[in-house]
């Protein structure tokens, strides 16, 4: 039972954990059913819902990195995960005011988007459709925070900030003359 629309890991077959201060990916068994009661999800702390929103907004950043990995390094790339996510970010952006107001129907669209994001990773057999450089930066902050006893922010909010940073860097790189 999902208690907050805060992340896309509910359907995931992997998990990111800290082991001896190092962020690692470990296999996980995905559930056969995800229950997301909209009244319960809408009653979650707004910070958690906002974290899920920021994490979902970062998906275009992840996809851009996945495409870049295909073009530059010849890494595998699947179209199906993109089809799964087609229109999801746009629908959630359109519901932004309702999500901020914790409107049950709007929070339901966020939860659906996060669930589809997790399913896109399962379809690809990799986290790349939903986790790019923005997640690596967030994981790095987690490791530094663990080492230096920092108070960290919620995962999705860290990812959102890192996505802004990566997007600015990508724009700068694309503007360089050859």
Language-model segment annotations:
Residues 3-91:
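A glycine/threonine-rich phosphate-anchoring loop and its flanking beta-alpha core
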């Amino acid at each position: 039972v999902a208690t907050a629309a805060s992340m896309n890991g509910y359907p995931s077959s992997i998990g990111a954990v800290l082991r001896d201060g190092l962020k690692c990916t470990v296999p996980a068994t995905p559930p056969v059913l995800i229950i997301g009661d909209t009244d319960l999800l809408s009653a979650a702390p707004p910070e958690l819902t906002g974290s899920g929103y920021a994490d979902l907004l970062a998906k275009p950043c992840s996809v851009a990195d996945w495409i870049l990995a295909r073009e530059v390094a010849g890494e595998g790339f699947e179209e199906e995960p993109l089809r799964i996510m087609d229109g999801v970010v746009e629908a959630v952006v359109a519901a932004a005011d309702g999500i901020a107001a914790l409107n049950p129907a709007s929070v339901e669209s966020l939860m659906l988007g996060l669930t589809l994001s997790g399913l896109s990773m399962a379809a690809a057999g990799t986290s790349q459709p939903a986790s790019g450089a923005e997640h690596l930066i967030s994981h790095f902050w987690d490791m530094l925070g663990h080492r230096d006893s920092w108070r960290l922010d919620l995962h999705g909010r860290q990812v959102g900030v890192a996505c802004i940073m990566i997007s600015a860097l990508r724009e700068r790189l694309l503007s360089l003359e050859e």
